[in-house]
Structures are given as structure tokens and as C-alpha cells.
Amino acid sequence: MKVFPIFGRRSRSAAPIPARGAGRHAAPAFDDSADDQASYDDTEAWTHETYDGDADGAAYAEPAPEGSLGAHGLAKTYGGRTVVRDVSLNVRRGEAVGLLGPNGAGKTTVFYMITGLVKADAGRIELDGHDVTHLPMYRRARLGIGYLPQEASIFRGLSVEDNIRAVLEMVEPDRRQRQRDLDSLLEEFHVTRVRKSPAIALSGGERRRVEIARALASRPTFMLLDEPFAGIDPIAVGDIQALVRQLTERGIGVLITDHNVRETLGLIDRAYIIHTGSVLMEGKPDAIVASPDVRRLYLGEEFRL
């Protein structure tokens, strides 16, 4: 499935960014249609909604605290086969969390339910304690959930700087501030020297840096990284790990799913191991690697960090 990039948004408030000088409830500058305005109004209302339980009256636990992205009791069934059952996890701002497990375990389905690409059959997804379970992907993005797909998502027909500028133009109305933000992102992610280069000419590592810089142009509070090490040369692995650390140093919460277990465990603070559709274990990398069950069912007895 080809997925185009969905970006986060400028701040942690519920509304898209209005033009400078406008009130909080003014229509955002980049929403021109009535359909977009209706979507915006719906998104504005989410902070005032409450959720008392599912359709059967089952109550959920108290909402997660502000500064967190959480999933509670997620379940998914395809054709009578349950692939995810009662999965709960939490990511706090400023930490990197791995979502790992063997092929077919259900981790990708869990990840896609959190991004909004797959609809959950049961359970609840919360951002800063508010229910976003039924919001589509683009509205979650407006609220601060950024997503970087596995596939190359860069705009290949644009230069490096125009890739980033395209997002800044949606969220920053002041031209001079946009230029300052652009220069800052180019410098921070070490792509200033290729700013005029066509995106199609970038190496794998350069492309990832530009994609992350472009995603950050909208100031997300959480980033969901789908296979960030896919298609990356071994020499660039450390580069990607450093980029993830830059995100957490900015106070951004990061959720990573990847088949490159060693590289992922080398940069995250915690991990959830999914096995046969459920959470087998949650813990720090050292505890994960030391777990007899995780080694027997997933890592193998000879695995070492």
C-alpha cells in the first residue's frame, strides 16, 4: 500500500494554525473549502468530548496524562481471524518506544491503528488524554501526530529546500519566519549543502534526513516511524539513530516499528514485544533481551546487543 506523507502540526493545541493575528477559532489559512472547515470544526470539538465506554457499555480506564500518546485494549479481526487482541501501550513526550515482534505477530496492525491507517474493531486511542480513536489520519496529524512511512515520501520533483518550504507555507504565515525556520532545519539536519539539489538525487541517508526535517516543519508532538532503517546502508544506521535522538531531545515522543531489531533496541528507551496479537512484554532494552520468553519466541538464544 502506497501511503503519502501525513504531517503533524505546529502546536499542541487542538486547532489548526490560524493566520497570525487571528483568534483561536478563526479558520486556518490553508483550509479553503467548506468541507475542510467542517472537518476543522469537528477537530476543534474533540477537546470538549467525553467518552464513557464502548457500545456495550464497557468503561475504559482514566485518560492518559497530558504529554502522552496511548492505546488501550486495541483489537482487530480479519475474516474471522483475530490478529490483535487487547493491546495497550503508551508513549510519553521525549522518549523513544519500540513496537517489535516476529512477522505476523500483529505489530504492524497495531501501529497502523495508532496512525489511523487501520480502523480498530475495539479499544481506544488517546492523545494527551483525549479520545482520537475515530478521527481519520489527517485530523490526527493536525493534532500533533506525525507519521513517516516506510516508502520514500519525499517530493522528488522539488529541491530539498522546497520540500521543507512546502510544509512551512501551510503552518507559518510570516514569510521571514518561514525562511528562518527553513534555514534552521536545513542546518540542524545537515542538509544545507544540498538545499538546491533535486530530491531525487539524494542518498538514502540524506533522503531520510530531509523527510524528518520536513515532518518537523509542522511541529508535531509525536512521530510514528515505520521501518526507519529500511533501505538504509549500514554506514547510515548511526545517522538515523542520531536523528531519532534529535527528535526526543526536542521533546517529541517517538514510536518506532522496524524489523531491524538490534538497531532499534540500540536507540529506544522502552519496547513493547507483540506476539500472536498480544503484548508479550514491555520494558527497557536490557530487560527485553534478558527475558527467556522473548529470547525463546522472538530474538533467539544467541541474540546480543
Question: Which positions does each model-derived feature cover?
Answer:
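Helix-to-loop junction immediately C-terminal to a conserved catalytic motif
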Residues: 115
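Conserved catalytic motifs of ABC-family nucleotide-binding domains
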Residues: 219
